[in-house]
């Protein structure tokens, strides 16, 4: 990639300190993707699949809607970190105010966001993660796995915050074969590639969340080829998952022995395995049919 000058945005973004390193082995990864693609459902089911294996899992929602952990709390709202920061300084917050336990003991955190039309959601995510750092959340809670669920329609400084080294070192993009989902996935991958070159993160692969559109697998495989990555798991479209969502729970909780629960367990294993490998940095291949 050609040498570029640092933009005002990047200068602002990189002035934040790196999070303190955890004193125990820990796997951190983030799920990105177009809004409505199923990131939060996927993240919650992966979290519960890993928790059912005896792992301590922390799920951090980085979406202004603050609904990333909803399926692990049966729809019960959780106080967001940003709402707490409106009342006092980050140094005055208690960790137990920011971190709550959900189904299976999953540690749930919601960054939150500003009121619609006021403030910057990306900056809110930065503030929330800095508040967790101030309370040394990783070393106190000692999670084995940390999952960031991040809105990926716009990869600005705040929404890119989890990509930074010390937060999420492995990025997985949830996509379907729909054109807008593929377009968003391609843009996210380019952003990840930029950070990879600086040593911040790497693309672990694509998660195909099927919508049963024509040539779906073929289109996503073509995208994976363009990005020099792979599909780590395919999730078939399932009424079982939709029914669980309507009930406000994960399919891992509603039907733990069902076929979709088994598929999420396979996905959880595949993601952890991918985190242990070192794939090439994502980049655009010559002759790609996708517009980045």
Predicted region positions:
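Extreme N-terminal, non-catalytic leader segments
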Residues: 1-37, 41-58, 93-94
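C-terminal lobe/tail of nucleotide-utilizing enzymes
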Residues: 1-23, 193-292
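Conserved beta-strand scaffold positions in the cores of enzyme catalytic domains, especially
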Residues: 28, 59, 106-108, 231-234
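Conserved catalytic-core segment of NTP-binding enzymes
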Residues: 134-145, 150-234, 243
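Flexible beta-alpha connector loops of hexameric P-loop NTPases
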Residues: 113-123, 179-180
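Residue-level signature of catalytic and energy-coupling elements of molecular machines
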Residues: 35, 109, 128, 149, ...
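Short, glycine/acidic-enriched loop or turn micro-motifs at the edges of active sites
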Residues: 64-66, 113, 152, 212
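N-terminal phosphate/diphosphate-binding loop that engages ATP/GTP or pyrophosphate donors
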Residues: 49-111
């Amino acid at each position: 990639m050609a040498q570029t000058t640092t933009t005002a945005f990047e200068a602002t973004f990189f002035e934040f300190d790196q999070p303190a390193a955890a004193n125990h082995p820990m796997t951190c990864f983030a799920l990105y993707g177009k809004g409505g693609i199923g990131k939060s459902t996927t993240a919650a089911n992966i979290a519960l699949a890993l928790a059912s294996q005896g792992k301590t899992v922390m799920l951090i929602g980085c979406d202004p809607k603050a609904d990333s952990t909803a399926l692990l709390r049966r729809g019960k709202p959780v106080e967001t970190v940003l709402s707490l920061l409106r009342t006092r300084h980050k140094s005055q917050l208690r960790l137990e105010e920011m971190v709550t336990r959900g189904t299976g003991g999953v540690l749930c955190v919601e960054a939150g966001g500003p009121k619609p039309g006021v403030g910057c959601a990306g900056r809110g995510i930065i503030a929330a993660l800095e508040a967790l750092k101030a309370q040394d959340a990783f070393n106190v809670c000692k999670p084995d796995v940390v999952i960031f669920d991040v809105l990926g329609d716009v990869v600005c400084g705040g929404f890119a915050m989890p990509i930074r080294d010390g937060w999420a070192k492995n990025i997985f993009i949830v996509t379907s074969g729909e054109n807008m989902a593929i377009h968003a996935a391609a843009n996210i991958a380019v952003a990840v590639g930029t950070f990879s070159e600086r040593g911040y993160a790497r693309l672990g692969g694509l998660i195909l969340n099927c919508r049963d559109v024509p040539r779906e697998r073929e289109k996503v495989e073509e995208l994976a080829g363009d990005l020099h990555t792979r599909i780590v798991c395919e999730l078939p479209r399932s009424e079982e998952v939709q029914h669980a969502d309507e009930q406000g729970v994960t399919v891992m909780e509603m039907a733990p022995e069902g076929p979709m629960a088994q598929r999420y367990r396979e996905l959880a294993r595949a993601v952890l395995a991918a985190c242990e490998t070192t794939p090439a940095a994502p980049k655009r291949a010559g002759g790609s049919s996708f517009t980045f």
